[in-house]
Amino acid sequence: MNRLLIPLFALLLLVGCSASSGGAGNGTQTLTVAATAIPHAEILKQVKPLLAKEGIDLQVRVFADYVQPNVQVVEKGVDLNYFETKPYLDAFNRERGTHLVVITGVHIEPFGAYSRKYKSIDQLPDGASVTIPNDPSNNSRALLLLAKQGLITLKDPTNEMSTLKDITANPKHLQFRQLEAAMLPRTLDEVDLALINTNYALAAGLNPTKDALLIEDKNSPYVNYLVGRPDNQNDPRVQKLAKALNSPEIKAFIEQKYHGAVLPAF
């Protein structure tokens, strides 16, 4: 009886150790990345065959929100994520007491303001209803875009963490509503203006370069990063993914696929 159990236990232990080491069988190693659907998961799909040549099976888990991709990396449900800017990551780390780190910058998504009621920002009426993201980083990003257009004045127009409390002048008496970023495209039929992250704008069928009444210029500092943990940032698999994301093939894909709505950051 014991002679049978001991080899069986050893076999189970060996299988368990193999599963936790990231192996996918046949010498292939897995790497799992959390991402939002557009453009992040689309870009990762293009990277997949590049990593396959390196013996890495890239697996992508798509999320619809901006919280779970970070939570999953912290809790080691996934290895990395690819969806966020540095200001957003810094705010998340500060609020949650986490220590996620940037691996490499990949692309920029110029942030835009959209309307289904008006064709020009000059048509925006007094007391217009405006929806903006409720997370600190993108909330500030929306306000900075409005301030640059002169629709509001901020206490410090260079502060990347400005809030509604920092508005010192609001000549058009804009009425703000703060919502989760993913919800903003759904508000277009009921509000005068919605400030929307490009990934959600693209998913809603909007073309930022044609449909946005206001849009950040190409010098936007809001690069989207591949993000990991201190314990895996130097993992060879992670470094190979970072190199692939900054490859000429991916740069060409971004330029040809998104026509300026998404820009390479390398």
Question: Each PLM stretch: what is its role?
Answer:
Residues I103-I152, K251:
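A conserved helix-loop-strand patch within extracytoplasmic ligand-binding domains
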Residues N26-I38, I56-V62, S129-V130:
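Short, well-ordered beta-strand elements
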Residues L13-G16:
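C-terminal motif of bacterial Sec signal peptides marking the signal peptidase cleavage site
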Residues S18-S21:
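Bacterial signal peptide processing site
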Residues V60-V71, T158-R186:
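Short helix-initiation/N-cap motifs at beta->coil->alpha
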Residues G105-S115, L202-K243, L263-F266:
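Periplasmic-binding protein-like
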Residues A91-I103, K117-Y118, E190, L195, ...:
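Ligand-binding "clamshell"
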Residues A37-R61, Q68, Q72:
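Short, polar/charged alpha-helical segment
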